[in-house]
C-alpha cells in the first residue's frame, strides 16, 4: 500500500513522514527496506563503521526485516513492539548463543533509534526490548615479555615467510587490527608519511615511527622475496605469492606460541586483546579505544575495563 505514491523516493517529504508516523500498520516492507538502506548509509558516512561491522548489521537486520515481512503477510495487524517481541522469541527458538542474540537485539535497537532520530517513526518500538545478558569470559592477553618471546621465534629465522610473520606480529600487536583486517591489507593501506594504517575512509590506526621503518623496509625488500606477480596488491603474501589467509596466519601464530613455550591458547585475537588492554592501562579513553578497534558498540570495548587474568 502506497497511498501517496512516494514509496520509491529516497528523500522523504514532511507530508510522507507525517502520514507514516500515524499509519505504521500500513508501512510496507518495501518502505522499511528503504529505511534499512538509509540506516546502513548513515553508519557508513556518519559513523565510519568498518565493512565487517556493516556486514554484521546487514545480516542481522535482513533477518529482522524478513521476519516482520512474513508476519505482515499473514494479514494480522499488530504493533511493531509486539512484532519485535515475537522476533526475540523466534531468535531464542533458533537456539542462537546468548552473545549472538544480544548482538541481533542491539542491531535492532540501533535501527529503530535511527528511525526515530530521522523522523521516520514517532516512538521507538524497540526501546523496551530486553537485551540478553552476556556472561563475559576472562580475556586472554600477553604481557610485554610474553609478546617478546612470541616475536623472537619469528625473528630468529631468516626465511622470507618468517620475516613476513615478524612484521605481521608487530603490526597486529601495535594496532589491534582484527585478523581479517590484517590479511585484507593492501600495500596502499600503509601510510608511511603519517605512520598509520588506513582501514577505510573513516578509520585510521596510528603506529610508532619504529614500526614505520620496519614496514618501509618490508615493502622495499622482504615482501619482494614472496612476490611473483607485480600486479598483486596484497601486503602479506604466502609462499605462492598470493594473499595469506586468516586461517594460515592463525596456524602460524599457534606454531610460534608453541615453540615459545607459551601456555594456553594464543591466537591473533590474543594480540588484539593485548593491544586494547595496554592502551587502557596507558590512559587511552574508552571511546577513543572503540574507534581504534572499530567496535560498533561501546559495550564491546568496555569488556577490557574488567579485571582479566593473563593467559594460562
Regions found by a protein language model. Give the residues of each.
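Conserved catalytic core of the tyrosine transesterase superfamily
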Residues: 16-312
